[in-house]
Amino acid sequence: MTDRIVPATLVFREDGTVVSPLYGDIYHSAAGALAQADHVFIRGNGLPERWRHERAFTIIETGFGTGCNFLATWAAWRADPSHCERLHFVSVEKHPFAREDLRRAAAHIVAYTTITTITPIAPLVDELANAWPALTPGVHRLEFDDGRVTLTLVFGDALDVLPNLALRAHAFYLDGFAPSKNADLWSPAIFKSLAKLADERATFATYTSSGAVKRALDEAGFAYRKVDGFAGKRAMLVGEFAPRWRVRRHEPPRAFSTDRRDAIVIGAGLAGCAVVERLAARGWHVTLIERRERIASEASGNPAGVFHPMIARDDNLAARLSRAGFLHALHRWRALERAGHAFSRSTHGLVQLATSDDEFERMRESIDALGVPAELASALSRDDARALLRTDVAHGGWLFAQGGSISPAALAAAQCAAAGDRLSRIVGVEIARLERGGDGRWRALDASGATIAQASVVVVANAADAARIAGLRHAPTQRVRGQLTLLPPGSAPAVPLPVIGDGYVVPLANGVTLTGATYEPDDTDATPREAGHRENLERLERLLPAFSANALDAGALAGRVGFRCVASDRLPLVGELGDEAAAAREAAALTGARLRDVPRATGLYGAFGYGSRGLVWAALGAELIAAQIDGEPWPLERELAEAIDPARFLVRALRHGRVA
């Protein structure tokens, strides 16, 4: 992976404090981690009083450690009857603990706390540990208390990851090992990165009062003052962001400004229904418009789809996005299930088989070189694959222990059910275009020009039609036909898990097997064809040699056709859309523009171009859009968000003088 994560080693000193053998320093004061968190960071930032005046409040912490600062803050938020509506806690950690080590460390600290004036913390430890993510580089978003508390963990070196975050912080917890033990975390570069994320009223607190830290704070635009430290420590620093000069070219993201929290989502497939659920969870009232008579009727209406991350030796953008999307989707799906919105999915893993011995060796080497955790993926020899799948295979491959298959339509229905009475549906109506009125509200119009719905925000999530409806000239997408084949009981090897490789095979209910799929660009025929079934049978024979393609009459098989929407660079288009008309007017000044310089179509967002990866990308894409609309911390690195920014094609056109 980009930089493999080296977990922290759990060691206790005789006095019960947790110590890092790597840095030779303690994680917390011997006088108590939770008491230290309360004195230094919570009260040092004027909490809980300050968050009472915000709808949402964002904290950044440098150094998650044992998690006690987060646990203490979460408990304080719970105990405050006037707390903010949503609390966002973002924490960077280079060496996170493994799940059970984190549980042991936090539970030990909580057991010996002397704080009795806040919400009991012991139950929160288990919630945190149970949700703890795989130790992979990048951003991991966890949700607690029905999504009102989010913990965004960023695993990696703070010097690298802080400049790659997109958020607006109200408070900073400057933690970490002592400056003498970990100088990088207190370097001027760190404070300059934090200054670019600070709200105008942001505060900070830290236990240290070293001269080097004070100089770095001052240079970055933070005003500081000394106050009494914790447990007899003479002094600590608190202060606020108060730059004496302009310190940043781009302001950190703000919430979309509107008095009416209503939105239109066009397209009721995986992309659209995921957006519906995420906006409704934040209190938005959503109108979902679908041209078919029911939701998930097009590509999302397939009997099953497979979900798994992508692994590449160079850990490229697509691989990082698929890993982030896969892990985020699992977290969201489990939350839906816990809330009583169950849907059909397999939970016993998925196997990806190599197409040659050389490819298997590359797959095995990639796992080792990238340091992929076994809970994410592991190498599977040919013999092991045979034993696991109970049938012959030509080569080994990967086991994705948390991968599997899912009913896309059932997932979409669960997401709509979770939205409850905040969702209104309009089906059987096709939107022809969008227009923004003088009042700033968007109107969705049909072919006759009649207004079907209006709202402050619109999200186009209707695949290949999205760019047309939004009036985008610089969003190159292609419609790709995919034909599936259904095999009757007993006609194919009865594999217990979904298998992918050159094609895929998914066991369905009642012994039926799903296999596919063809890949036919610009073919608009929606009728299953015998040639497509034959192609799928031949692909299945290569995947599972025990199957004979000639044993079945391709012309007698049932199947289904769906259409993928694929962008020219094979990445999705997710986020706020560019204002192409404004860009054309300013084209001369935008020839060297970056994405953050491009004018945007205020209140208009896209979620399309997911190709064959809708199950993996839709949940993360929806969370990104909801975060952008509400001005929350983004759930992935800015580099990845920019890779899928719908305006990326507009920027390329501007650079080549093709916008007029």
UniProtKB/Swiss-Prot annotation:
Its EC number is 2.1.1.61, 1.5.-.-. It is found in: Cytoplasm. The keyword Cytoplasm applies. Residues 1-242 are annotated as: tRNA (mnm(5)s(2)U34)-methyltransferase. GO terms for biological process: methylation; tRNA wobble base modification. Pfam families: DAO, Methyltransf_30. GO terms for cellular component: cytoplasm. InterPro entries: FAD-dep_OxRdtase, FAD/NAD-bd_sf, MnmC-like_methylTransf, SAM-dependent_MTases_sf, tRNA_MAMT_biosynth_bifunc_MnmC, tRNA_MNMC2, tRNA_S-uridine_synth_MnmC_C. Keywords: Cytoplasm, FAD, Flavoprotein, Methyltransferase, Multifunctional enzyme, Oxidoreductase, S-adenosyl-L-methionine, Transferase, tRNA processing. It catalyses: 5-aminomethyl-2-thiouridine(34) in tRNA + S-adenosyl-L-methionine = 5-methylaminomethyl-2-thiouridine(34) in tRNA + S-adenosyl-L-homocysteine + H(+). The keyword tRNA processing applies. Its main location: cytoplasm. Its cofactor is FAD. One of its GO terms (molecular function) is oxidoreductase activity, acting on the CH-NH group of donors. Residues 266-660 are annotated as: FAD-dependent cmnm(5)s(2)U34 oxidoreductase. Catalyzes the last two steps in the biosynthesis of 5-methylaminomethyl-2-thiouridine (mnm(5)s(2)U) at the wobble position (U34) in tRNA. Catalyzes the FAD-dependent demodification of cmnm(5)s(2)U34 to nm(5)s(2)U34, followed by the transfer of a methyl group from S-adenosyl-L-methionine to nm(5)s(2)U34, to form mnm(5)s(2)U34. In the N-terminal section; belongs to the methyltransferase superfamily. tRNA (mnm(5)s(2)U34)-methyltransferase family. This is tRNA 5-methylaminomethyl-2-thiouridine biosynthesis bifunctional protein MnmC. It comes from Burkholderia pseudomallei (strain 1106a). The gene is mnmC.
